[in-house]
Design a protein with these regions (language model features):
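Extended glycan-interaction surfaces of carbohydrate-active proteins
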Residues: 1-38, 67-119
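Feature representing long, continuous alpha-helical segments
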Residues: 37-48, 60, 64-67, 104
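Structural helix-adjacent loops and short alpha-helical linkers that scaffold large soluble proteins
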Residues: 50-64, 111-119
Length: 119
């Protein structure tokens, strides 16, 4: 329930404090950031652990995770990956429109996919 096509949610949708949409005042957005938004930057460490545990059996899931981002390249910041996404579908992009952390995480997942394809 934490893993989405746009990153890892910061809180479960089942939790009473969950905020699935990043909107409103600065306080509302800050609450959503830590209570439900999807952070792309967490995908790198998540996939690294999954590959270590499951090996090549995780390849399809890793591919599923990154495919959604390529669809998003022309949506929020042309040719860039956003900092965060709504926790609720359709996971609209928010925050920095060209996030180095998000880009690094996706590059790490691509690297891991290639590494485990070769093994």
């Amino acid at each position: 329930e934490l893993v989405t096509r746009r990153g890892i949610r910061t809180l479960s949708p089942r939790h009473s404090e969950y905020k699935g949409v990043y909107e409103g005042s600065q306080t509302d957005r800050d609450l959503a950031y830590y209570n439900g938004c999807c952070l792309t930057s967490l995908l790198g460490p998540y996939c690294e652990v999954c590959f270590k545990m499951k090996g090549a059996a995780f390849l399809n899931k890793a591919q599923w995770l990154v495919n959604g981002f390529y669809e998003d390249l022309n949506k929020h910041g042309v040719g860039a990956f956003s900092e965060l996404y709504d926790g609720d579908p359709p996971h609209e992009p928010h925050g920095a429109i060209s996030s180095a952390l998000s880009t690094a995480a996706l590059l790490e997942v691509e690297y891991l996919k290639n590494k485990y394809k070769e093994e």
